[in-house]
Amino acid sequence: MSRIGNKVIVLPAGVELANNDNVVTVKGPKGELTREFSKDIEIRVEGTEVTLHRPNDSKEMKTIHGTTRALLNNMVVGVSEGFKKELEMRGVGYRAQLQGSKLVLAVGKSHPDEVEAPEGITFELPNPTTIVVSGISKEVVGQTAAYVRSLRSPEPYKGKGIRYVGEFVRRKEGKTGK
């Protein structure tokens, strides 16, 4: 029994869900998301509640059931509240700037790195060393934040680099002299 798949998704006020042959469109105050799901999972909308049902209890169906429910719930949360990831930069001279929708990063290279914001993603800079990536799609927000982090991931000796806020970076000792 998939415990996640059996949970009911409650639609918040202002969120509409349309299911057209397992192509689900979710509209809300922050925007609209569309995704195609497996035809094996039946999606039922009853008022403000959405339930998912699977045809049998095979292992494959259970995994698809739980995954579909989680993806659908992320769509509902995204169009109603949105998602955001915060990154912090540590290092001498490491800073970020916004040029329109482009994020320009100075992270100790001979040239600045430029990151174009994908569709539906916004960058905010509360200060020059903090980056906030926000949008309605959890998947795209996470991928964009991971890409920004990959431009200079934290190194274990001095801890310099771009990291998620609250991320623990394990530190190593340097070489011991003679």
Swiss-Prot record:
Q: What does this protein do?
A: This protein binds to the 23S rRNA, and is important in its secondary structure. It is located near the subunit interface in the base of the L7/L12 stalk, and near the tRNA binding site of the peptidyltransferase center.
HAMAP family (UniProt xref): Ribosomal_uL6_B (MF_01365_B)
Alphabetical UniProt keywords: Ribonucleoprotein, Ribosomal protein, RNA-binding, rRNA-binding
Complexes and interactors: Part of the 50S ribosomal subunit.
Question: What GO cellular-component annotations does this UniProt entry give?
Answer: cytosolic large ribosomal subunit
What organism is listed for this UniProt entry? Streptococcus pneumoniae serotype 2 (strain D39 / NCTC 7466)
Q: What is this protein called?
A: Large ribosomal subunit protein uL6
- Pfam annotation, one family: Ribosomal_L6
Name the domain of life this protein comes from: Bacteria
Give the protein family: Belongs to the universal ribosomal protein uL6 family.
Q: Do you know which SUPFAM superfamilies this protein is assigned to?
A: Ribosomal protein L6 (SSF56053)
- Record flagged with keyword Ribonucleoprotein: yes
